[in-house]
Amino acid sequence: MPVLAILKDKSCEAAQVKLNALGATLAFVDASRIESFAQALAGAETAISCMASGNLHVDSIDDFWAIDRDANIRFGLEAVRAGAKHVILVATFEGRDSRRLTEFSDAKECAVDAIGAACRQAGVAFTVIRPTAYFSDLTNRAFDSVLKRGRYTVIGDGSHRINPVDGDDVAAFIADCIDDPRMADSEHQVGGPDIFTFRAIGLLAAEVIGLPGPLKIRAIPLWLLRLVAALATIVGLVSQRSRRSAAILRWMIYSGSHDAIGVSCGTGRLCDDFRSKRDGQIRVASLRNEAITLDRDPGSGRHQL
């Protein structure tokens, strides 16, 4: 089956290389214009959107209203117009439960509602995939924090549970939804095979890294986050940036105080992902040391880097 990967920017070269290696054709679109999707989606039988705002510190053209809501709606509506038989949207795990508490969740749920309505009207299958949290999210936050600072942060007491999932396993699950009509036209909350508390994730990272001393765990009280969110909400009456920050804080409060356990899919394990990241760091350090040795100037004793 030919695959066309639609990207909204060219900033991530690693993703482009990986997609090309898998045999996908790449198309770049302006996510702010519905016309931009028309050519890319022409003739598509199945359209899958994983679009989400890149990180928590974004401006108005790349925040959750612009991407999670508006860009996804443009994509979904154009996919239906283009004649797709199946539209798949990757959404947040807790979105339906937390949308009334935070605009961060409501943004993606607005896309779920709008695309779902368009698909029902057109007789198109609509599937929603809700992963708990990707390994990459935890690697970038937990692992890197423990590795660089020997410190780890939890919201509340860190006792709430989650079964994070490998992105490759989610991709395989989506492929199953395409191949098996019984899995289509449904919502799926998916996670990985292992359940952790948020505190245990930091301890796992410390164990894999081989942290020489005890891990410093900093617990941020929920009351403090609620206070900051309330202040940001007030300032948000006159500042879009503060309104955005308040929404993200309320989402963090919800996510950090509720379990997120999805149906186990795949075989990828967080401990193996952490070990892979650790081994990668060791290889980089080894190559750097070799480069210093090879480039040493014997005359001056200085490194030519």
Segments from the language model and where they lie:
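Non-catalytic, hydrophobic alpha-helical segments
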Residues: A47, V170, I174, V190, ...
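Active-site beta-alpha turn of Rossmann-fold NAD(P)-dependent dehydrogenases/reductases
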Residues: M51, I88-T92, R130-T132
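NAD(P)H-binding glycine-rich loop region in Rossmannoid oxidoreductase-like domains
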Residues: K8-R81, R96-S98
